[in-house]
């Protein structure tokens, strides 16, 4: 009888150990579901936001402020507010086309082809980065490849592989907050596997029921003389009314 009681205890201990071992696996949702949750936080039908972009060089830094109106991932209108040198510069995105108006020359130019890879006002962001605002679920396949702690937050590490051809980055690696479903770190890679850019997200706040990082620090790994670019959203409103007239070339000169 004693042996039988001991066997039961051992079996219970094994079952408990097994259940504890598989618990983390059960708590991890599929990679596609994680991407969907990220999209729900970061994407919206439309949004209006004010931001500051601080470009850090080896000798000095400069800050540019702007206001952006965006509808989905196809249309956006940005007006730069300061400093005086950039004030009045406007950027219009319609589908796959991008125009920039310069008040100093009173000219509107279209940015296309290889020009899209150029830096935006000397920052670590390219025009391609500003153009592509599609949902991650529409453009990448995902796989959970590990876990790591970032800034005291438990994260899943997601490996993203492009599933459409027209991507600036063939693959990405995301460190996703396991509780809030927002990326806290990201690495962007070329088709060759070379690391092109790295970004870190912080100041995550809840806005209108969604978690959103208000600050992103970008680093172009190939850009010489750059100490990185900080992008901070100072005010944002989701799903608000936006005047239709903004999304026309005529609005650039108004």
Please annotate each region the language model reported:
Residues 71-72, 74-75, 94, 97-98, 150, 180-182, 207:
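Structural motif
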Residues 38, 66-70, 201-206:
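Extended lipid/amphipathic-ligand handling interfaces
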Residues 107, 131, 153-249:
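Gly/Pro-enriched, hydrophobic low-complexity segments
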Residues 2-14:
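Bacterial N-terminal signal peptides that target proteins for export
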Residues 28-46, 52, 61-62, 87-90, ...:
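Flexible, processing/modification-adjacent segments and terminal tails
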Residues 13-24:
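Bacterial N-terminal signal peptides
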Residues 49-85:
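N-terminal, post-signal-peptide region of Sec/Tat-exported proteins
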